[in-house]
């Protein structure tokens, strides 16, 4: 049995990220998912001044205050979602405030059903399982795409 230290695990993760980046340049991964309602937490966090400014700075758009959530339902899409964990993406750093720490967020440019700009966001602190994808856009995506819970969407993620 081999046991890795935290430092060793970090080094392996960085190596894996480098390999994914090397082989995934200009790659598009597709994720199929079904729209689902969230708990409204995305709205709360996206509306915080730090995140609103950071998303604008790092993603190039002022996001609608909320996320669209979708649940992955097939194996290939889940594998593509897990690939995002190994990819660098755009890192929005954590932010320390007097009473709390706002966690970092990894983001990827994307489109949904050919609509952009969109970003897949992966907060380091989340209550969602990996099968739930959170999406940001300057648009209220439910209205723009006329989506209801259970509707299927195709997300193209640009690595």
Swiss-Prot record:
Q: Which residues bind FMN?
A: 126, 134
Enzyme Commission (EC) number = 2.7.1.161
Cofactor: record remark: Binds 1 Mg(2+) ion per subunit.
Instruction: Using the UniProt record, name the top-level EC class of this enzyme in a single word.
Output: transferase
Q: So what does this thing catalyse?
A: riboflavin + CTP = CDP + FMN + H(+)
- Give GO terms: molecular function aspect only: magnesium ion binding; nucleotide binding; riboflavin kinase activity
Q: Which UniProt keywords apply?
A: Flavoprotein, FMN, Kinase, Magnesium, Metal-binding, Nucleotide-binding, Transferase
Report the superkingdom from the record.
Archaea
Work out whether the entry's keyword set contains Oxidoreductase.
Answer: no
Q: Name one Pfam family in it.
A: CTP-dep_RFKase
Please give the InterPro entries that the UniProt record associates with this protein: RibK_CTP-dep, Riboflavin_kinase_archaeal, Riboflavin_kinase_CTP-dep, Riboflavin_kinase_dom_sf
The processes (GO biological process) annotated in the record are:
FMN biosynthetic process; riboflavin biosynthetic process
Residues at which Mg(2+) binds: 67, 69
- Keyword Magnesium in the entry? The reply is yes
Cofactor(s) demanded? Mg(2+)
Its pathway, per UniProt, is: Cofactor biosynthesis; FMN biosynthesis; FMN from riboflavin (CTP route): step 1/1
> Which positions are annotated as binding CDP?
38-43, 139-142
Chain's role:
Catalyzes the CTP-dependent phosphorylation of riboflavin (vitamin B2) to form flavin mononucleotide (FMN).
Question: What family is reported?
Answer: Belongs to the archaeal riboflavin kinase family.
- Report the protein name in the record: Riboflavin kinase
- Identify the coding gene: ribK
């Amino acid at each position: 049995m081999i046991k890795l230290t935290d430092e060793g695990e970090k080094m392996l993760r960085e190596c894996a990220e480098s390999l994914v980046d090397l082989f995934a340049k200009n790659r598009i991964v597709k994720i199929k998912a079904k729209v689902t309602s969230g708990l409204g937490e995305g709205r709360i966090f996206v509306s915080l001044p730090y995140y609103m400014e950071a998303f604008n700075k790092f993603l190039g758009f002022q996001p609608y205050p909320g996320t669209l959530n979708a649940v992955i339902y097939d194996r290939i899409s889940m594998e593509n979602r897990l690939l995002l964990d190994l990819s660098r993406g755009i890192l929005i750093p954590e932010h320390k405030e007097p009473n709390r720490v706002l966690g970092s967020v990894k983001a990827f440019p994307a489109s949904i059903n050919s609509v952009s700009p969109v970003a897949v966001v992966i907060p380091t602190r989340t209550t969602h399982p990996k099968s739930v994808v959170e999406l940001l856009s300057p648009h209220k995506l439910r209205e723009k795409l006329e989506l209801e819970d259970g509707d299927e969407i195709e997300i193209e993620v640009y690595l």
